[in-house]
Amino acid sequence: MTKKEMFYEGKGKKLFKTDDENLLISEFKDDLTAFNAEKRGNESGKGVLNCKISTEIFHLLEKNGIKTHLVETISDTEQVVKKCKIVPIEVIIRNVATGSLIKRLGIKDGTVLPFALVEFCLKDDALGDPFINDEHCLILNLVQNEAQISEIKNMARKINSILTPFFDNKNLRLIDFKIELGLTKDNDLVLADEISPDSCRFWDKFSNEKLDKDRFRQDLGNVKMAYEEVLKRILN
């Protein structure tokens, strides 16, 4: 497979065309961003760690019936992925209240929610990725119909039901995470983007130490060490 020109660069990855019009190469970057890229940094080796973590998680999900865009991992930082039309919604799944949720609703930080909360944000940096509801999704034509909203929520909850016990077994609490979904040329809804400490909140099961991008957001230090610890636990 030939890697051709880059046609998209996001906060954490670059996408390159290939000699197959249905396949892309996704390259993980060392860049760190927070607060809609108002805060920026760089952590050497982060791209390698996120690529390895996301590869392991996507393989786990595929084994459990979740369709993903991943075809294969071809280097320490590169994956071959199916070309998708990305649904312009960030899907957030919350098991424990923290972050923006406690600011918006006044819930005590660390409160375990009675069930997994699924929220949507509009993917629009200029607007600050605002929270939206089902009706917004329909009015803005972000989804095809109400049935697709249900499909998205069901997939999000199924992913959470697979990952929560998996990480618990690794002595990690999956506090919350965000996913992006895409539609393939066959109109199949698939998990795209990545699942990594960039997109998840992981707390140590016993100490509640943060092992994710909050270490960068909150200037806690040792970002790379936290990502390395997550990978080590996943592989053990």
From Swiss-Prot:
Q: Does the keyword ATP-binding apply?
A: yes
Q: Which reaction does it catalyse?
A: 5-amino-1-(5-phospho-D-ribosyl)imidazole-4-carboxylate + L-aspartate + ATP = (2S)-2-[5-amino-1-(5-phospho-beta-D-ribosyl)imidazole-4-carboxamido]succinate + ADP + phosphate + 2 H(+)
ATP-binding as UniProt keyword: yes
Which Cys pairs are S-S linked?
A: none
Q: A Gene Ontology MF term for this entry? A: ATP binding
Q: What is the residue range of the signal peptide feature?
A: none
Q: Which CDD domains match?
A: SAICAR_synt_PurC (cd01415)
Q: Which family does it belong to?
A: Belongs to the SAICAR synthetase family.
What's the name of the protein?
Answer: Phosphoribosylaminoimidazole-succinocarboxamide synthase
